[in-house]
UniProtKB/Swiss-Prot annotation:
Active site positions: 149
Record key words, sorted: Amino-acid biosynthesis, Arginine biosynthesis, Cytoplasm, NADP, Oxidoreductase
Uppermost EC category: oxidoreductase
UniProt keyword annotation of Manganese present: no
Main location class: cytoplasm
Protein name stated in the entry: N-acetyl-gamma-glutamyl-phosphate reductase
Reaction catalysis annotation: N-acetyl-L-glutamate 5-semialdehyde + phosphate + NADP(+) = N-acetyl-L-glutamyl 5-phosphate + NADPH + H(+)
Pathway involvement of the protein, from the record: Amino-acid biosynthesis; L-arginine biosynthesis; N(2)-acetyl-L-ornithine from L-glutamate: step 3/4
Organism: Sulfurimonas denitrificans (strain ATCC 33889 / DSM 1251) (Thiomicrospira denitrificans (strain ATCC 33889 / DSM 1251))
Family listed: Belongs to the NAGSA dehydrogenase family. Type 1 subfamily.
Xref: HAMAP family: ArgC_type1
Amino acid sequence: MSAIDVGVIGASGYTGLELIKILLKHPKFNLSYVANTEGGATLSELHPSLKGAFECNVVKVDIDELAKKCELVFLAVPHQAAMAYVKPLIEKGLKVVDLSADYRLSKDIYEEFYCPHTDVENLLHAVYGLPELFAQKIKKAKLVANPGCFPTSAILGLLPFMDKRVAHTPIIVDSKTGVSGAGKKLSDVTHFVNVNENLFAYNPLLHRHAPEIAQKLGVDFDEVHFVPHLVPVTRGMLSSIYIQVEGDFDAFSILSEFYKDAKHVRVSKNPVDMKSVAGTNFCDIYVKQKNNILFISSAIDNLMRGASSAAVVNANLMMGFDEELGIPNIAYVP
């Protein structure tokens, strides 16, 4: 099969940059179209780190022109903005991987936590892009909703125990994320002086990723107590999960059996860390049980498994390729 022409809408941010870096090295995807809402810049002007490696003009989005050049498009744009692109792209016959929240949730839940949904027809047909659960559906999908970063780390840690029905709500998820998770746009919250040598929770118990965790685990929103924290590192995410369990079972064995065929989940006998997954699509998971309390630790790269490399894995499956094709698997260490 010849290379597949793909495009990226939303090239300005960190997830757009990570997508471009992966696609430039991908043996079967040819990056043919790079756009954002304004256009008028070169890629190296937006991302100086790419200077000398790859150059192109970043154009203003033109759906007709995009449809002539590409078979698949990645949307690395904010929620609500994605809805404006998905409908015409699908109508033009393109496949879409959407990295926003626009197609992850049911209409009612989405509108409760985000805004009115203007593309319910495609929402009903979107496939949640978690290959460990939905690989076969992703292969047939025209539209894949890439999971959020926090939900990815929480859901992958909890799934095996919810599946075996040994775990009971409430679920407590305490997550730490690097500053890149807040995006590229400047703010007082992510200002160096505020972040450096500091640690703080934000939007505790009401963060918009909590209903995504709940919906995909099949529990009520009120049963998931999720608190994210910003830590002074560039990239990475570590979720500490606490849940009550019952019955006589080996937690490590349940985890290992559930993920025995998973290509991007590594079950660890030792506590996991962010550094060991930086720059990769891996999710590393550790579990420890004390009496009726189960502790689960889950580590991902928020920009990779939590966004861009996960999106390329989904695109691989949609186009009939092996999910590992072109996906970085060696961490940024040291």
